[in-house]
């Protein structure tokens, strides 16, 4: 999801401006920009509607609280995409200033980490609810979930601070301004010593981001849902296959949406093949930007309760506004 300048959406570790987008053909840039604009428009509308449903149309439970903040992380990201698309159409020229360069990069980093962490938290919640029902009955409360939510946001913010610090605007000799990472935090962009230091810090950031932002959460999700699926099948807790569909949706969507991003970031460190970088960049933009649209829809509609409540909520929006009795049926998942 790296789109800030050169589609460096969500904490670009190296600078796609230098390393990849300089190879992009105009058609590729247009594809990326259109993907961002479309994702922003549709994602803002759908995610905003989902947030409304979860906040005002459903009973506040652990489940709805976790999903609310998961979708909130998507919503925050979609609000910034138009700026990234505009920069892409302007050949990665950044005309929004250094402060917004830092804020956007930090915000997008925050959105990536929070979405990944909340997916893991939802998996752990399913695990505890299914395999430790007694403990869950005693401790699994909205207040407990609120502490989890707070911990996720604090952890994601802490991991995003380096990318807020490293991000700077750079003026080249032609007067072009780019928003890119300066890992050495030095104004001496050409020094070999500084370039070596930047490379070392870049590698360290990539490894930590890959481990904490993908590999570890992926294993947590796989472990939790595998255990849940085994227990559900063993006890025949559900006659429907819907719970298994939800589990598979979580695993597949996580892998499909985030694996291309980390592959592209790894390639930036190991290859200069322009075609390969271009293809992986486009794939990264498509999967991560549309992730903000389709992942919330999948999670809300695959689950039967979410689907029912969502349908009722659409019809009840105007009724709850204009009718004297504004109560709306709420369902607890």
UniProtKB/Swiss-Prot annotation:
Alphabetical keyword list: Cell membrane, Disulfide bond, G-protein coupled receptor, Glycoprotein, Membrane, Receptor, Transducer, Transmembrane, Transmembrane helix
GO CC list: plasma membrane
GO molecular-function terms, A-Z: complement receptor activity; G protein-coupled receptor activity
Residue stretches spanning the membrane: 31-53, 65-86, 104-124, 144-165, 210-230, 247-268, 284-303
Ranges of the Extracellular topological domain: 1-30, 87-103, 166-209, 269-283
Homology family: Belongs to the G-protein coupled receptor 1 family.
Protein name as annotated: Probable G-protein coupled receptor 33
UniProt-listed InterPro entries: Formyl_rcpt-rel (IPR000826), GPCR_Rhodpsn (IPR000276), GPCR_Rhodpsn_7TM (IPR017452)
